[in-house]
Swiss-Prot record:
Active site: E138 (proton donor/acceptor)
E.C. code: 3.5.4.13
Catalysed reaction equations from the record: dCTP + H2O + H(+) = dUTP + NH4(+)
UniProt GO MF annotations: dCTP deaminase activity; nucleotide binding
Pathway(s) per entry: Pyrimidine metabolism; dUMP biosynthesis; dUMP from dCTP (dUTP route): step 1/2
Residues that hold dCTP according to the record: R110, S111, S112, L113, A114, R115, D128, V136, L137, E138, Y171, K178, Q182
GO biological process, one term: dUTP biosynthetic process
Quaternary structure, from the entry: Homotrimer.
Keywords in alphabetical order: Hydrolase, Nucleotide metabolism, Nucleotide-binding
Feature: compositional bias, Basic and acidic residues: 172-181
Stretches the record annotates as Disordered: 169-193
Protein name: dCTP deaminase
Family: Belongs to the dCTP deaminase family.
Organism for this UniProt entry: Klebsiella pneumoniae subsp. pneumoniae (strain ATCC 700721 / MGH 78578)
Length: 193
């Protein structure tokens, strides 16, 4: 069962759930909290590697990732990031989220954006118990026109689901947690699997 707006507010008030900066009540609706787009992005450089062998030797995977991923792009205030049709890019939420060991989060894109072809998360929409940090967004433009994305715009909604008990291995305590405390548009770390 997911938390309703009253429970989300109570968990925030009690410090069991943290969203920084704390959203105003107008952004807590029914069973979700609206999140906004941050100002950090990362893109893919075209034609810099013939392919990425996802199950290949880790050193080769790491080298291919280094070739295809851009450095992090930090947009100045007021500027837009343009996502062209068929492009994939990474970005982050403006808000940082910290979940306790007994709560899982779910990120959903906005229907209004999806109707323009914008996918906010390609597949990874679960936020693990024990997570702390900004949430990386996996943008894909499946539409016909470039989309101007501006930091601060509403980009998605988070919902929260209590677990039957605290997780034995929450994300913040796992040795293999590749994205712990991320604040920027962190590239894939599949080579760390």
């Amino acid at each position: 069962m997911r938390l309703c707006d009253r429970d989300i507010e109570a968990w925030l008030d009690e410090g069991r759930l943290a969203i920084n900066p704390r959203p105003p009540v107008e952004r807590i609706n029914g069973a979700t909290v609206d999140v906004r787009l941050g100002n950090k992005f990362r893109t893919f450089r075209g034609h810099t590697a013939p392919f990425i062998d996802l199950s290949g030797p880790k050193a080769e995977v790491s080298a291919a990732l280094d070739r295809v991923m851009s450095e992090e792009i930090v947009l100045p205030e007021g500027e837009a990031f343009f996502l062209h049709p068929g492009e994939l890019a990474l970005a982050v939420t403006y808000e940082s989220v910290t979940l306790p060991a007994d709560l899982v989060g779910w990120l959903d894109g906005r229907s209004s954006l999806a109707r323009l072809g914008l996918m906010v998360h390609v597949t990874a929409h679960r936020i693990d118990p024990g997570w702390s940090g900004c949430i990386v967004l996996e943008f894909y433009n499946s539409g016909k026109l470039p989309l101007a994305l501006r930091p601060g715009m509403p980009i998605g909604a988070l919902s929260f689901e209590p677990l039957s008990g605290p997780a034995a291995r929450p994300y913040n305590r796992r040795e293999d947690a590749k994205y712990r405390d991320q604040q920027g548009a962190v590239a894939s770390r599949i080579d760390k699997d």
